[in-house]
């Protein structure tokens, strides 16, 4: 209104009441009326001032205030009338420019006049502009030099004058120039072709406006002028007419801001990268390091690359050539840089001459030397010199040492500092050492170009890390040198990296580097050795304190003894370990080999790069790694990254360098790489710093082993430090896993050497530090308690490919080295360390990735690379490749070898070994957690007692994880071990097989009888377990029915080729393992194996007798103490989140009763999630799982009398036959007890069937973890994300465990597994595992009713069964049936089976494995409130339990179950599980 009124008031001359536009006209002495007239058309919005806004909008600077702000840049605004007073000078000045341009660049000057004319034509002031142009041409002699009172000498004069003028008069207007120059600048800005005909939408003054406004106005005139000018200027610059370009540019002083704008705009637009002409004015990040405006358009078009090249590339070239030629590249790079500078200088639009700018740049360079950067813009990425860094600084003198020490160690330090103050201390030490490593990394940053493969990068963890010493040693010095000086160049790179001073410095550096390279290679070798020694010493010092904490000799023994054992073990069982260790090993060994390697590295850099590339390709180069994560990335980002990759394959080298920079420097010099990034992306003013989070040019080929976070500057993302390390390990672990076969020998050597340095990886280094440095365990004990929940989560998140491997490898090493007597202490140490590590790691990881996405990344990076790399991560895209079939085969072979070799020695640790490294860690962590957290409960002690043996196995677990479940096989899980081995080797396929074997075993031990029949089935092992849990089993026996025993036996052996094989193996392993004191013979439940396959976990081994071992499956992390069944069960439950995951089967009968005590154990949901994820992936990977289920499941189903859970567990034994008799947990197997009874689909299966979204079983395990309610909370959430989607993420990834916890914190007590996130598309029965842990604490679902729990699901595919949801608590059923009714509970669980119409097992009953823990039915009472399922449904559960078992997962139809389900009200039967929905429903069918 006002606008309309105002305009009306003003008159119809088009001048609005708003005098801003009219002011322009007044100032100009022109009538902007025409322009306004065009704008004047008033629409309805105009009354709102929209039109006025539009009018004003065209030239933001049209406002008087803006005018004053941006003087004379608005082509439409002639502040001073053209009386010539002020403008005459400017016109004359423009004339000099035009004339100069005409003379020097006739094309440009002419285009400018033409453009100006076009602009003037467009503009009202066309005539005046034309006149000005004309006048300018005649007045051409007038230049800024004249304005400055200096001889014009169009080129020389202007240039000279510009040189004389340290700054543009425009920039620093004088009173004299104010009238003339300033106004001239204004008018010329106004006349500036770049501004276009109408009111300039851009800032009036480029100079004042960062040149953002000064950039070409997006108008035809400006564009044409820009291209023309660009062409001419670039031509002049390129032609070596920088003087002309500069002169012409300089001579159009007023235009210079504009021309810079033009040039910047057109070039910026054309190339998407136009360093601000007034880089001095612009923030460093805004300006390209070089005022590359002067760069040729061609150069500029490639400028983004050149910039990468310039900063990284020059170093890279230097180093490439240094590597190869040593000098050629530096020369080339230098030429590029000087070229840029020259071009930059010459065409530099700023009034100041290139030389002046250089002078300024030199000043800036001086300023750059400071941490504040060129324009006093703080270079936050600049590594500040701190006392801690002083050593690094001194090392920086050595160049490579500084960065070498800085990066890896600092990464580690960062990880460790997060992990532990002790670790932080160590980190400080290592920070220095890491500087060396990072220096290598940094150098590698440069090196990668010589090693063109970004694979170098992605082999980074292993390759670059080891190459750090090799090439890194070489390049470290250079890189350190370069980076020493280069950080300012990077900044300058942002601002005016091209300044001659910087160039000279760089040349000097390059020359020095070349000269010093030889000595530095030698020095690097020596220094690397020193650094490695330092790292080792620091690690040993830390380790010694840490082991002193528990086992001082352990760290040395582990480090020294473990490497020998770990060497073979690492090679076989711990591909990841070699990887994780390898980088450090590279560093450590490389110091020795560094001189040779460094030199040969330059020569054999490509060969090294090749092998590393191979390994990296397998493990996933950063690009691949990112490809993996690119899924996480928005498509546009992926696309952009791909495009960038394509655009910048040259840059890819640089980018590798760049990524290396970013990756490595992300830690110590994140800003420099960051700056490099910023300069690259930021150089476009539109740069979104968030891109900094991503590798500047993510190479899709580079596997996202390095989490995007890794690319985030550590400053930007905390995880940048930790995660990048993790990715390194992931790269190393993954790549070296692949490399383990390729590079294992050297890696192993290195590993042996750098066994401890492996902790370099942030998660891993941190974990390794924790594992090895046992200082952590103490802090970690507290952390374990505090972080117990998260302990596994971090470990799970990180353990996979990264964190888990390092600690796990360390654990494994530890176990291997001191598997026997030391096992308990080691184990406890490890456990303490691991939980703590995990806690810290997860905390770190969560800090880094608070989002599920972050966790998913971590999980994928760690879990997928590590745990899943072998098993489920093989499914993971990034790591499927990493763990190629060949690799998997190798791993499996190694596993089997290890298995066989370790069967006896690894009995105790075989369990853990089966567990994926992170699970092993989790187990250790859980056991530790239990030890620390649940010491009050017998669980903790027993876990320690019982788990110690198993946990030590976990130490080897990494190997086992690597080598399937080699150790696992040896222990009772021996059966699982081999089965798991196959499963792991198959990484899911085997999982089914393993599940089958597990199914058989589980069926034998746990299936129908839970652990009852295992006596018969398992024979000695079961008998032993039986002894432990026989009393409990006695309860179950009655319930499990001997007939079921026989059935289970036959079935257990009958599970199928794999199942039988594994059953036999399990039997063997069980017998052998059960012979172990606390051996987790119980792994009999295939579930454990099942879980093992995905998350090869030693049988849950709750300490329950092997029979109870049914549970043991779930605690993939359970160490499987078989000791006191109940205590063990509690231990396992308490200490094994994984157990709880699958344990919904906790053997609700007796064990769950004891397990009620178990409840205290809070399993980090991450562990469960991890397992579930693993299981899910395994499930996805191995359709055979259903086959397992079929053999095992058939047996189970055949044995309906057995606890349905058991029977279902057998069915479910596809889970490894977690034989969920106690595991009514909504077993993933939807059909087994579709009614839910035997179905207790044991969301363990969720783990097993990682891809199966119904990971509710995690929730079930959560029941137990629920006992540690908060901790357990995590798991349920894992349910919430569709597990399919989360499969890779693993629940932990997809859903931050903490989130899961949060989700379930509300559900905390029950953590009802019934709460299946709708996204868990096929989470058949959302078993409110609360039942398992539902023990009294959880039995009391917080007021949440099953419906509530389910309701979150109501939106989800499976409709929350109305009241009928019958989140039957096994507890409830258990109450009614008593623990013995546990089977009934299983049956009842089917009641829980809510028609999950859409869930894979459509109705997979939300079986509340409460019965598992509900033995007393205590949970029941608590669950009673939640007992949304009508009591009637409970009874049906019993029926279902017996009858559903026969169902045998027949397509998971409830047809069989239906008989039972009818009462179950859940109506799971109506919803025969959609087999399709079941991950492998068909497979499930017998």
UniProtKB/Swiss-Prot annotation:
Keywords: Coiled coil, Isopeptide bond, Phosphoprotein, Ubl conjugation. It holds the Pfam family BAT2_N. Residues 88-137, 219-235, 288-300, 960-986, 1181-1191, 1457-1474 have a biased composition (Polar residues). Residues 422-433, 478-488, 501-519, 1025-1055, 1062-1074 have a biased composition (Basic and acidic residues). It comes from the Eukaryota. The modification Phosphoserine is found at residues 166, 168, 222, 226, 387, 415, 479, 555, 621, 762, 793, 1070, 1159. GO terms for biological process: in utero embryonic development. There is a cross-link at residues 251, 751 (Glycyl lysine isopeptide (Lys-Gly) (interchain with G-Cter in SUMO2)). InterPro entries: BAT2_N (IPR009738), PRRC2 (IPR033184). Residues 1-20, 39-306, 320-341, 385-519, 531-658, 792-847, 893-918, 950-1080, 1177-1205, 1410-1443, 1455-1486 are annotated as: Disordered. PANTHER family: BAT2 HLA-B-ASSOCIATED TRANSCRIPT 2 (PTHR14038), PROTEIN PRRC2B (PTHR14038:SF4). This is Protein PRRC2B. It comes from Mus musculus. The lineage of its organism: Eukaryota, Metazoa, Chordata, Craniata, Vertebrata.
